[in-house]
């Protein structure tokens, strides 16, 4: 029987020729399986084969990884090993798949960062008319916060997609799904002032332009958001998506229904929207602790 490393090389060739995977995915498989093979060789010697590996050895490998990388990366490496063994099972090269006995490590729940209301309000005021592109930048910030758009949705807007009189936006979301989202009065005013300053435009013209008069791109929007955020607070990094998180969190804290927020954000699944409930529950507990008389820490007895 072939040593493990030779079996991995054969599997990689299969992925490249039969599965037509991208170079990036192939490199990830190769890197993860070579790391696994190095651990097996250190434990069992260079002549060890895939059949020699049992679930106990695999558990030790994952335990070692647990001290070095995140659970999401552990899960990816385990998935690569599972695929490798499934391939060997189909070929009859092994009698079992030890990776099937190992549960995928649960990913850490990372709560989305958001600005508080005072920070969001201050951010909207940072661009000024005196600055180059100040009106444009304010319109961009107000639109992101007012409607919770993805940055790709914002950069894809044309003038015909906005209804300033009705306070509405037509957005093309993921998977080519169109949705209508409200546009707050501050955003309406900011967009109107921006369009007036540039002399309007045709219906099909991009809503937001760069310095050359072309459609603004996502990288430029990210730079705009980051630059203005640093005027109000010393955050390490804030992205346009932070304003999307901020929109959703403030909507929920204001009493909006989770289903309505799902529709506004263009989420296909409610489970994607539910992450914002964790943020708001933290806020509710903070309010409860401060406001409810029985929630306060009792004074120590003399």
From Swiss-Prot:
This is Tyrosine recombinase XerC. Residues 2-89 form the Core-binding (CB) domain. InterPro entries: CB, DNA_brk_join_enz, Integrase-like_cat_sf, Integrase_catalytic, Integrase_recombinase_N, Integrase_SAM-like_N, Recomb_XerC, Tyrosine_recombinase_XerC/XerD. It comes from the Bacteria. It holds the Pfam family Phage_int_SAM_1. It comes from Pelobacter propionicus (strain DSM 2379 / NBRC 103807 / OttBd1). One of its GO terms (cellular component) is cytoplasm. One of its GO terms (molecular function) is tyrosine-based site-specific recombinase activity.
